[in-house]
Amino acid sequence: MHRFVLVATGGIFGSLARYVLSGVAQKLTTSSFPYGTVLVNLLGSLLFGLVWGILENRITFAPEARLLLLTGFMGSLTTFSTLTYEGMVLLQSHMWLQAALYIVGQTVAGIMLVWFGAGLGRLV
């Protein structure tokens, strides 16, 4: 039960962070393009890599820290389900190029940012 509480606690704060960050980012533009989702997915990828790099290489953390930070917080901060839904909406709107850039761009950039964040975390 303790592990579920850790994941849920991290999830509460991660989802609140996603809601605030994506809302602020979306309000800064008049475009209907989902910039808020892009921001949280890319920032989340960078932070995931950073935390992972720190947890794996620099600081000895209990396995519970991984559950709280990576599974709970980071899992609810990033929004793959939202990415796929908004990608589908772009496709249904016949916005082929935007959909491709949205989906492929975030996926490639996310992988690169996890790698960069992990490297950065190893240096900390």
Swiss-Prot record:
It is found in: Cell inner membrane. It is a multi-pass membrane protein. NCBIfam families: crcB (TIGR00494). The gene is fluC. Fluoride-specific ion channel. Important for reducing fluoride concentration in the cell, thus reducing its toxicity. It comes from the Bacteria. It comes from Nitratidesulfovibrio vulgaris (strain ATCC 29579 / DSM 644 / CCUG 34227 / NCIMB 8303 / VKM B-1760 / Hildenborough). This is Fluoride-specific ion channel FluC. Na(+) is not transported, but it plays an essential structural role and its presence is essential for fluoride channel function. GO terms for molecular function: fluoride channel activity; metal ion binding. Its main location: membrane. InterPro entries: FluC. The keyword Nuclease does not apply. The keyword Ion transport applies.
